[in-house]
């Protein structure tokens, strides 16, 4: 297994979503939808981890406000949009944007949960599951900029409520799906799902298989200063990377209703994946690298709900990912020849108890406890080809570790409705976080106020605090090689969790125009950065804790339409961002930047019978920063054609993304004696997908065996 914690190498900035809103009778309804930033290669990851999100508002979909959350009718919002799975559907929500292959909401990292159940799975594993779930499974979505403690989540949360029952008892429904995407290389996906609804028992089954090849390039130019003799070395490297992969995903969910508000449910998620990568470098350095990785995931969760408001549950996760790499590299008089194996095995358990009370006069009370524990078994070994073992080879020392992590969370909160116009929700959580390095107690308050002054007008004020923990592999004391060996990826066992404080004010005017202001302050923000070593010709990629990061922003989203043939929205954002680190090697910095973002999304109805729609989305973003990195202006343009037929049960979709091949920025460093430019490849992609929903039929009734005369 090769874990790459370094500055990413590819990014697709695609503006996808378009949605709408509508005021229905006496309900306060509104929509929003979001732009998306897609990353194509792991090495571009950290560049987009902290870029601003884009909240986009449409005109047709509906949303209702309640205490601390917005309830969206997402199935209506994605009608006519090129959305085939739950992950893509969530990007239609207001303020949701994809950065580094992960979803963010309102300038914050966001936790996505299914049916209110927080999982032990990592973000990447959860997103893989969401991408395999058909969008048709969504019943509704709850969005919270600051989730109350009773949800066992801190910070922003998206709760996806799945459909578990369809029609009358005995009904079975399913979907088959196929996808072909041609970028530089081709990739494919096949998926099948079934949903069964009984009188007391319901079940869902899903299998998905994604596979294909990928290709990308990196053109690096560097001026590397050496302290010993004051010389500057010119580095020009060109890298090509080809990879192929297979991923199999499986989900089985069951629900059994014992009585009203009395139920038992179990969900299993499994995955098996393989990948093989070959990388070649030419120029100042010549290198060839071959690597592979295999991973297994097993996750099971049991939930029990009682009529008195008591909930209890347990979850287990097992993950294993061994990998290897063979590298031959030459740079001047230096040579690297080695074979390395690494791996990670994680066992994680979670147990919880939660109690909720609905009291008189609009009061609600909730409290509970959550305990999680995990053990991370990781290793990394190096073998020199000539010595056949890691002796006097100059390679990193072998590492084998067993790291245990424990978290205990105790919380209590209340909610109160003051008539129909004012709602409040407050909670307080106390948490202990214990690892071999840290043993800390923290307090997390959350406050949400919602005010509905009139029909179509919504005002929501939020304040929260949050803590985000580093990835397991990021805190291992390991060293990996990247780009033929000129770049090294270092783990950081002393990496701290980051603490975030955020507040936001959202105002929706006439259920149509959305205005939002926000401010975030993150202490000990963990960011992976590049640093040119002054002692040797070596680039270091390592996660470090900045002193803090601050972001403040304003946003206006304006939907408009022309007749029945065009739905559009324009989103404008102004953002101020600041990052400070007083102990960044020998180069302390305190940098800030003002930038703007403009997004225009259009859906053209070419025909209603047959149902044919064209979407054209464009985005332009100004210069941003990440530490001493300067991220230049970038943009993206995409188009999608969607044909729905067979009574809405069949959908054929074709697309062209990154039409102008301008979505990939070329980040650079020009700070003190640090001088680097990375040019990453950007390829236009075209694709075709087909989805067919079937069923809605009842289970056949078969004649029972006559046992009336048996004993």
Task: Please annotate each region the language model reported.
Residues 201, 247-273, 290-445, 450-458, ...:
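Face-selective signature of the C-terminal outer-membrane beta-barrel domain
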Residues 467-516, 521, 541-553, 561, ...:
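Outer-membrane beta-barrel signature, preferentially recognizing the C-terminal barrel domain
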Residues 178-182, 198, 209-213, 270-274, ...:
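Transmembrane beta-strands of outer-membrane beta-barrel pores
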Residues 42, 53, 86-89, 126-128, ...:
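N-terminal periplasmic accessory domains that precede
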Residues 119-146:
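Short acidic/polar hinge/loop motifs at secondary-structure boundaries
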Residues 87-122:
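Extracytoplasmic beta-strand/coil segments of soluble accessory domains associated
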Residues 22-78, 98-100, 107, 155:
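Short, acidic, small-residue-rich periplasmic hinge/interaction motif at the N-terminus
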Residues 348-350, 496, 502, 514-572, ...:
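Outer membrane beta-barrel strand-and-loop segments of large Gram-negative receptors
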């Amino acid at each position: 297994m090769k874990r790459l914690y370094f500055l990413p190498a590819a990014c697709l900035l695609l503006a996808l979503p378009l949605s709408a809103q509508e005021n229905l009778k006496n309900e306060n309804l509104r929509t929003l939808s979001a732009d998306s930033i897609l990353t194509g290669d792991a090495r571009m990851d950290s560049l987009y981890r902290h870029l601003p999100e884009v909240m986009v508002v449409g005109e047709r979909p509906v949303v209702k406000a309640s205490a601390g959350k917005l309830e969206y009718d997402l199935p209506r919002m994605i009608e006519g949009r090129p959305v085939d799975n739950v992950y893509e559907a969530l990007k239609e929500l207001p303020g949701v944007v994809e950065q580094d292959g992960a979803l963010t909401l309102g300038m914050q990292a966001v936790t996505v949960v299914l049916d209110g159940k927080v999982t032990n799975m990592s973000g990447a594993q959860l997103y893989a599951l969401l991408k395999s779930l058909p969008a048709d499974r969504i019943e509704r979505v709850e969005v919270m900029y600051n989730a109350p403690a009773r949800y066992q989540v801190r910070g922003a949360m998206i709760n996806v409520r799945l459909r578990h029952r369809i029609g009358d008892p005995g009904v079975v429904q399913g979907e088959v799906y196929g996808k072909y995407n041609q970028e530089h290389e081709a990739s494919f996906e096949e998926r099948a799902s079934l949903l069964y609804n009984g009188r007391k028992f319901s079940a869902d089954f899903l299998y998905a298989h994604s596979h294909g090849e990928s290709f990308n390039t990196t053109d690096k130019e560097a001026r590397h200063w050496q302290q010993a003799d004051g010389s500057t070395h010119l580095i020009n490297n060109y890298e090509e990377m080809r990879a192929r992969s297979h991923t199999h995903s499986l989900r089985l969910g069951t629900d059994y209703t014992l009585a009203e508000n009395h139920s038992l449910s179990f969900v299993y998620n499994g995955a098996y994946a393989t990948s093989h990568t070959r990388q070649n470098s030419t120029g100042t350095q010549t290198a060839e690298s071959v690597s592979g990785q295999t991973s297994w995931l097993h996750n099971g969760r049991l939930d029990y709900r009682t009529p008195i408001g008591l909930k209890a549950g347990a979850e287990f996760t097992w993950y294993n990912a061994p990998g290897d790499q063979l590298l031959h590299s030459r740079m001047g008089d230096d040579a690297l020849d080695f074979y390395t194996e690494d791996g990670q095995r994680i066992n994680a358990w979670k147990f919880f108890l939660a109690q909720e009370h609905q009291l008189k006069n609009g009061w609600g009370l909730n409290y509970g406890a959550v305990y999680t524990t995990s053990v991370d078994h990781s290793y990394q070994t190096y073998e020199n080809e000539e010595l056949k073992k890691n002796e006097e080879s100059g390679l990193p020392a072998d590492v084998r570790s067993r790291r245990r992590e424990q978290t205990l969370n105790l919380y209590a909160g209340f909610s109160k409705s003051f008539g129909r116009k004012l709602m409040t929700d407050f909670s307080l959580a106390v948490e202990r976080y214990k690892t071999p390095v840290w043993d800390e107690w923290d307090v997390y308050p959350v406050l949400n106020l919602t005010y509905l002054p009139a029909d179509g007008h919504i005002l929501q004020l939020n304040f929260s605090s949050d803590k985000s923990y580093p990835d397991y592999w990021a805190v291992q004391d390991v060293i990996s090689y990247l780009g033929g060996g000129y770049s090294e990826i270092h783990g950081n066992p002393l990496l701290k969790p980051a603490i975030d404080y955020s507040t936001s004010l959202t105002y929706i005017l006439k259920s149509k125009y959305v205005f939002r202001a926000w401010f975030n302050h993150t202490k000990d923000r963990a960011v992976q950065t590049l640093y040119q070593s002054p002692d040797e010709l070596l680039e270091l990629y390592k996660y470090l804790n900045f002193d803090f990061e601050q972001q403040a922003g304003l946003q206006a989203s304006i939907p408009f339409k022309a007749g029945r043939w065009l739905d559009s929205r324009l989103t404008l954002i102004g953002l101020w961002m600041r990052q400070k680190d007083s102990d960044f090697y020998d180069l302390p910095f305190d940098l800030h930047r003002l930038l703007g973002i403009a997004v225009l999304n259009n859906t053209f109805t070419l025909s209603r019978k047959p149902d044919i729609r064209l979407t054209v989305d464009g985005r332009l973003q100004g210069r941003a920063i990440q530490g001493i990195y300067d991220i230049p202006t970038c943009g993206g343009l995409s188009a999608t054609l969607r044909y729905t037929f067979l009574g809405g049960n069949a959908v054929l979709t074709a697309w062209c993304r990154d039409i102008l091949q301008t979505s990939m920025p070329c980040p650079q460093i020009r700070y003190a004696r640090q001088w680097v430019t990375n040019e990453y490849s950007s390829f236009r992609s075209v694709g075709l997908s087909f989805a067919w929903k079937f069923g809605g039929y009842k289970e056949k009734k078969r004649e029972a065996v006559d046992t009336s005369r048996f004993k």
